[in-house]
């Protein structure tokens, strides 16, 4: 699958705040984006195309349940390609 991951301005603001608070957040997000490019259909579907995915923040030390929730919006051009927008965290 070849999915491109893009961010919204709102997501960038929220991610910047979390990156200042948790040192591992940038590395965690990089791993998350790589995972999302391979499998954009992970997480719980809230409505068609919109998904909620749990993200563990390593420096927070509480696993996925105490980590962040990332809201994504997926647009599929075909089954093997499309775009994933990171909407909120």
Locate each region found by the language model.
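Basic, Lys/Arg-enriched alpha-helical interface segments
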Residues: 1-64, 78-80
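Enriched for short, Lys/Arg-rich terminal
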Residues: 61-62, 68, 73-89
């Amino acid at each position: 699958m070849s999915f491109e991951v893009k961010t919204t301005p709102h997501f960038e603001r929220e991610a910047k705040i979390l990156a200042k608070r948790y040192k591992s957040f940038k590395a965690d997000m990089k791993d998350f984006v790589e995972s999302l490019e391979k499998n954009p259909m992970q997480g719980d579907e809230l409505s068609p195309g919109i998904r909620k995915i749990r993200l563990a923040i390593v420096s927070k030390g509480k696993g996925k349940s105490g980590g962040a929730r990332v809201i994504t919006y997926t647009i599929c051009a075909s089954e093997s390609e499309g775009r994933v927008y990171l909407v909120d965290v």
